[in-house]
């Protein structure tokens, strides 16, 4: 019994320390703001026809908001740290410069930014390059895209696809069709349908599958036998699936609406009920999935989830109660870590992971602008006073090298630009032009 004589005292100390820590966290989360509690809209833009300008609501001047968006675009597409590179008279690509490749992720993000900001030449250049150098024109993968390429040698780093690339390309092209029509040099709708139609004839033959797992009505990690039976939560964009039901016009409207509903319910399961965090990869049940290259945790892919949920709220607001609750949990957790100091990788319970996923040759935790940005976008669903502080944090953030020299104008930069678009009301559903 001698070894246990100190246990009561130890318990007292642990309880006292735990209570002290909880009290500190509670104090950290009691953030007040003169602007009061945020009040999210009750209807999405699909019905309301309008988009919130959160920056304006936060007290920033419209001229400054316009300048902020213009500078963010310039930094990512035109400045000395740009990731957009023109090739000849009619093509361009977006490069993950820190990893020396071009990806369907970045190319399709660039196209989305271009169609949102009405930059047709940029959109067309990116599409031509993607179609020429990444899209498979024949064989089992016909219509799909190689997800990574060396832009200097034009050699594919992989022939396989990442399902989010096709997801964005299709949505980009449908939006372009709605905005610019199909008679200005590129038949955007036909290009979107080519990908969609190619997707639906892939039945697993030669190992190539649909982008969707048809049984689960969920997007796959990769449309092949390797990734067909699991997923990436950041690929679950119910807002996009809703729009496919409206604009793809391929007779599968109900399937896409079912996928949107399923994606929302999937996110309920994938996101931790206290921290709001999700794993980069999961089973279709939402259970975290480890892979041979890394254990399950909230890492870089997961940064996109708050922004995706905010988009769904802004556009459709079909899952308001849960999405507001999600924003509260996530922002409570991050503010508890310090709005200006929270790290960029976590275990789902909020503890720091033992394994740190490196980026661009750097293997360390940092306060990354990409997560600062997407955490701020969650304020679209915010109901607390502290949600304003996340908006302010994004407003004050700078897309520039960190003190150790690390700089990511690609992933950090694109998420930064996307989030500024969301919070300024410039990331919108593009409906077809109607003639009077």
What annotation goes with each model-predicted range?
Residues 30-71, 100-104, 139-144, 158-164, ...:
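Extended ligand-binding clefts on enzyme/binding-domain cores
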Residues 110, 122-123, 185, 192, ...:
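Solenoid-repeat scaffolds in large eukaryotic assemblies
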Residues 54, 58-106, 114-136, 140-158:
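Internal amphipathic alpha-helical repeat/solenoid segments
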Residues 1-27:
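Bacterial Sec-dependent N-terminal signal peptides
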Residues 100-110, 156-180:
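Aromatic-rich carbohydrate-recognition surfaces in CAZymes
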Residues 352-436:
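C-terminal functional modules
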Residues 127, 173, 189, 196, ...:
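Inward-facing hydrophobic residues that define packing positions of alpha-helical scaffold repeats
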